[in-house]
C-alpha cells in the first residue's frame, strides 16, 4: 500500500499470474475443489496440493522499453471499435461458448481491484449475482454481433481465433468473413484442456478429436 502508484501495475501483473496458478482449482476457475459441499484444498483426493499450497513468489519481470502507445478499454468491443483509428492489424478472440469469463475469473478481479469489502455470495462458484453475458455467449445473437464487429473494424488485416466447438458454426463464420475481403484459414495444433482428472480415457480422446482450433486472417477490402 506504500508503493507509488506508477509501480503497482508491474507487481500486480506478477501477482495475478501467481494467483492463477496457486489456487484451489484444477487450473480452470469454473469450479473449486471440495470435499462434499465444503471447500477443501485438493478436494477429497488431495489433488495438486503442492501447486495449490506452495508459497507465492514474485519473480523479476521482463520489461521492454518501447515507444508504442497502449490504450486499454473496458467498453463493449462492438461499440469501441467504431471509434478507433485505421489500424494495420486487429486481433479478436471472441468468447466461444455460453459461459462468460466474468463468472469464472471474478476472484482475479477482486485481487486486481484489491477491494476487501466485496461480499462473495453463496452461489455455485461464489460468482457475483449481477454478472452479464456477452452477445457472443448467445446462440441467437452471436452471428449478428460478429458480423457487425467485422464490418465496423477499420483495419487492413483482421485476425480471429475460434474453434469448431463454438456457438458460431465454422461455415457460417467463414461466410461472414468472406463478405469483407480475402480470407486465409489456418489450422492450429492444439491440445484441449483436460477438464477433470477423473474423466475416462476414451472420453478424453473423443474430446481431443472433436475440437479443432483455427486462425482466420482476413485481408479486408
Residue ranges and their predicted role:
Residues 133-181, 188:
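Conserved Class I SAM-dependent methyltransferase catalytic core
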Residues 1-104, 116-129:
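SAM-dependent nucleic-acid methyltransferase catalytic core
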Residues 97-155:
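SAM-dependent methyltransferase catalytic-core segment centered on the flexible catalytic loop
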Residues 169-221:
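C-terminal catalytic and target-recognition region of SAM-dependent MTase-like enzymes
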